[in-house]
Design a protein with these regions (language model features):
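Short linear Ser/Thr-Pro motifs
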Residues: 24-25, 256
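A short, hydrophobic C-terminal helix/tail in secreted or cell-surface proteins
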Residues: 252-269
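Sec/Tat signal peptide C-region and signal peptidase I cleavage site
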Residues: 26-30
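Short, charged juxtamembrane terminal tails flanking transmembrane helices
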Residues: 271-273
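Mature extracellular "passenger" or substrate-interacting domains of secreted, surface-exposed proteins
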Residues: 31-250
Length: 273
């Protein structure tokens, strides 16, 4: 049985500190009165780390944004990154960024076993505009199980031909589970000191959930585990989004579920010149 903590990418929170000395402006503008950044430019870029991929047999196809495997049919994973940075309002609604699609087809032969995915985050004050924080990256592990389509019950514990198993047993992904809120600080130089913000990442489509014990066991990880089960003979897309708040998010934002992906602790301090 795999151990999720041992198999994880040694989830070490990345701490970045940026201190820029300067002379503060003679008087704070009205939009700086509360010292809060109202809008952020958020850049998120995801890629597969092909050097980390493990196949169940012979090597298959892997590139930064797409993976494919199988004989007699082709299954795979595709990453769709946003065209550019998105604007996120502080204490506003979640804003979509990265999407991941599983192309699930009946196959034989070698399949994906595991791969690491790297997410890189860049935060820049947009309103009022100011200098951005350095980019920070985190690698996290995806464990995958290509399940026998004809089993009953299925590897996920469900009944074959019902629900997600309607076309045969669904395949199983397990993803390193992240915390809900990641804190960072930014100082606009208004004389009020650095303000603390929290960035949280959510899966919007309702597919990311705690998995049954049977599904965790099938992948070879300990329960509880977090992941997806995807239907056979379909392409399923999971959409992720970000929110930035001035208080920790304690309940899911409407239209979202559990947070996942980037586990970042960004400590940024900047003085306006």
């Amino acid at each position: 049985m795999k151990n999720t903590s041992a198999k994880s990418i040694r989830r070490t929170l990345t701490t970045l500190a940026i201190v820029a000395a300067g002379v503060s402006s003679g008087g704070a503008r009205a939009d700086l009165a509360n010292g809060i950044v109202d809008q952020w430019s958020v850049g998120v870029v995801a890629q597969f780390l092909c050097g980390t991929v493990v196949w169940t047999g012979s090597a298959q196809s892997c590139a930064a944004q797409t993976m494919s495997w199988g004989s007699g049919g082709v299954s795979g994973l595709d990453i769709t990154n946003p065209a550019g940075a998105t604007i996120v309002n502080t204490n506003g609604p979640s804003v979509p960024n990265v999407a991941i699609t599983h192309r699930n087809q009946p196959i034989t032969g070698s399949t994906l076993d595991e791969v690491k995915l790297r997410s890189t985050l860049t935060l820049t004050p947009f309103s009022p505009p100011d200098t951005g924080l350095p980019s920070a990256s985190l690698d996290f592990l995806i464990d995958f199980q290509e399940t026998p389509n004809g089993a009953d019950p299925c590897a996920n514990g469900g009944v074959n031909g019902v629900g997600v198993n309607v076309n045969g047993c669904g395949d199983i992904f397990v993803i390193d589970q992240g915390a809900l809120n990641f804190a960072f600080q930014y100082d606009l130089g208004t004389g009020q000191g650095a303000k603390t913000y929290f960035i949280s990442f959510f899966e919007q489509t309702g597919g990311l959930n705690p998995l049954p014990v049977a599904a965790c066991n099938a992948v070879g990880v300990t329960s509880p585990c977090l992941g997806f089960v995807t239907p056979e003979s379909q392409s399923t897309t999971f959409n992720f989004a970000a929110v930035i708040t001035t208080k920790p998010v304690e309940i899911p934002v409407p239209g979202t579920l559990v947070s996942v992906g980037l586990g970042l602790l960004l400590l940024g301090r900047r003085r306006r010149a």
